[in-house]
From Swiss-Prot:
<keyword id="KW-0813">Transport</keyword>
<dbReference type="InterPro" id="IPR013082">
    <property type="entry name" value="PSII_cytb559_asu_lum"/>
</dbReference>
<keyword id="KW-0604">Photosystem II</keyword>
<dbReference type="GO" id="GO:0009055">
    <property type="term" value="F:electron transfer activity"/>
</dbReference>
<keyword id="KW-1133">Transmembrane helix</keyword>
<protein>
    <recommendedName>
        <fullName>Cytochrome b559 subunit alpha</fullName>
    </recommendedName>
</protein>
<dbReference type="GO" id="GO:0031676">
    <property type="term" value="C:plasma membrane-derived thylakoid membrane"/>
</dbReference>
<comment type="function">
    <text>This b-type cytochrome is tightly associated with the reaction center of photosystem II (PSII). PSII is a light-driven water:plastoquinone oxidoreductase that uses light energy to abstract electrons from H(2)O, generating O(2) and a proton gradient subsequently used for ATP formation. It consists of a core antenna complex that captures photons, and an electron transfer chain that converts photonic excitation into a charge separation.</text>
</comment>
<dbReference type="Pfam" id="PF00284">
    <property type="entry name" value="Cytochrom_B559a"/>
</dbReference>
<feature type="binding site" description="axial binding residue">
    <location>
        <position position="24"/>
    </location>
    <ligand>
        <name>heme</name>
    </ligand>
</feature>
<comment type="similarity">
    <text>Belongs to the PsbE/PsbF family.</text>
</comment>
<keyword id="KW-0472">Membrane</keyword>
<comment type="subunit">
    <text>Heterodimer of an alpha subunit and a beta subunit. PSII is composed of 1 copy each of membrane proteins PsbA, PsbB, PsbC, PsbD, PsbE, PsbF, PsbH, PsbI, PsbJ, PsbK, PsbL, PsbM, PsbT, PsbX, PsbY, PsbZ, Psb30/Ycf12, peripheral proteins PsbO, CyanoQ (PsbQ), PsbU, PsbV and a large number of cofactors. It forms dimeric complexes.</text>
</comment>
<keyword id="KW-0408">Iron</keyword>
<dbReference type="InterPro" id="IPR013081">
    <property type="entry name" value="PSII_cyt_b559_N"/>
</dbReference>
<dbReference type="InterPro" id="IPR006217">
    <property type="entry name" value="PSII_cyt_b559_asu"/>
</dbReference>
<keyword id="KW-0349">Heme</keyword>
């Protein structure tokens, strides 16, 4: 071991090992697939409470609603949606 070494394996040794690629060949595509399904099924909208793209405006509105009172914004928008 070289002087000043922390005892960790060198990065090059890790990424050239078979064990690394056996583990990551499964986990990396799985993470990507899980993220893709989370977004494409719409579960992300439900989990974070954001409106879906077709729910931002009512069909009769052609532009975004303008809030005139800073601290009463939520109640103004609630009135518009009723």
């Amino acid at each position: 071991m070289a002087a000043g070494s922390t005892g960790e394996r060198p990065f090059f040794e890790i990424i050239t090992s078979i064990r690394y690629w056996v583990i990551h060949a499964i986990t990396l595509p799985s993470i990507f697939l899980a993220g893709f399904l989370f977004v494409s099924t719409g579960l992300a909208y439900d989990a974070f409470g954001t409106p879906r793209p077709d729910a931002y405006f009512q069909a009769s509105e052609s532009k975004a609603p303008v809030v005139s009172q800073r601290y009463e914004g939520k109640s103004e928008l609630d009135l518009r949606l009723k």
